[in-house]
């Protein structure tokens, strides 16, 4: 009898441990105000007439672009951006970047985590990417609610480039604005430790972009955003080395403010802070006012 009780006790101890472990590994829920609080030391929040409350980083140069201070790695969710900037855990995985004619690059908060939010271009010699601006239609199409922003126009070309959701899947028609793109030689992509330093100089982008094709391939599978883009085997052939596939694991117990590396790599595991963001119809600005998003 005692042995049976002991066995039952051990069973429930193990079971409770598994439950606690699963709870510890589950994503936490936080309010979208988290972005305001944690990004304020690194940049300013301002109201935008079209996008609501937007954020702009301090201490970046006049020629800075998003997705340059870091590197690309292959993961179970496709290509993931490993940022070296202390605010990169938020701005490259949630929300979208937009180039504003008056403000420059601004970031719009979002609620869905992804390995990166970029469009991809590829040619035999080069691989490039460009930040994806917000587009309501695209997110509804793949089952993700982003926000109620209007479709965005880039006004830097003779023809306006409107981001309909079809373009994210069409490999031939969509061409991103040249000034927003970053290109790496294909033999350097996937293993160079600093994408911005290995990038092709801007004056060559027009020719490179003209000779490339769109390979953007974003999917929503099992409640996760998958960022495929450049073919993994093509990258391995060009670089002559096998890619490491990183497992993405939730990291919930983190100190955000003052941390240089919120997300960390250990072996083949990439520990990321990616809480589920709860939407709020109002978000604070730096002047402590509120306005509808």
Where do the language-model regions lie?
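Classical secretory targeting signals
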Residues: 1-27, 290-293
């Amino acid at each position: 009898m005692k042995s049976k009780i002991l066995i039952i006790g051990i069973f429930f101890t193990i079971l409770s441990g598994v439950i606690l472990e699963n709870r510890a590994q589950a994503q936490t829920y936080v309010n979208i105000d988290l972005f305001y609080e944690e990004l304020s030391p690194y940049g300013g929040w301002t109201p935008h007439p079209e996008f609501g409350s937007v954020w702009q980083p301090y201490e970046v140069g006049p020629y800075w672009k998003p997705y340059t201070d870091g590197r690309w790695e292959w993961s179970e969710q496709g290509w993931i951006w490993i940022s070296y900037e202390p605010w990169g855990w938020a701005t490259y995985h949630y929300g979208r970047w937009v180039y504003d004619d008056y403000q420059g690059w601004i970031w719009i908060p979002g609620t869905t985590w992804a390995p990166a939010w970029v469009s991809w271009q590829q040619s035999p010699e080069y691989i490039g990417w460009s930040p994806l601006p917000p587009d309501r239609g695209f997110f509804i199409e793949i089952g993700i609610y982003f926000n109620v922003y209007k479709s965005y126009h880039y006004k830097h070309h003779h023809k306006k480039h409107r981001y309909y959701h079809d373009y994210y899947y069409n490999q031939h028609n969509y061409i991103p604005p040249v000034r927003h793109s970053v290109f790496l030689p294909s033999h350097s992509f996937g293993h160079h430790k600093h994408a911005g330093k290995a990038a092709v100089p801007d004056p060559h982008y027009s020719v490179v972009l003209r000779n490339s094709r769109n390979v953007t391939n974003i999917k929503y599978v099992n409640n996760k955003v998958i960022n495929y883009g450049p073919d993994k085997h093509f990258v391995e052939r060009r670089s002559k080395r096998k890619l490491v596939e990183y497992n993405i694991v939730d990291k919930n117990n983190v100190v955000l403010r003052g941390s240089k590396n919120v997300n960390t790599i250990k072996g083949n595991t990439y520990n990321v802070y990616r809480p589920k963001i709860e939407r709020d119809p109002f978000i604070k600005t730096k002047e402590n006012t509120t306005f509808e998003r």
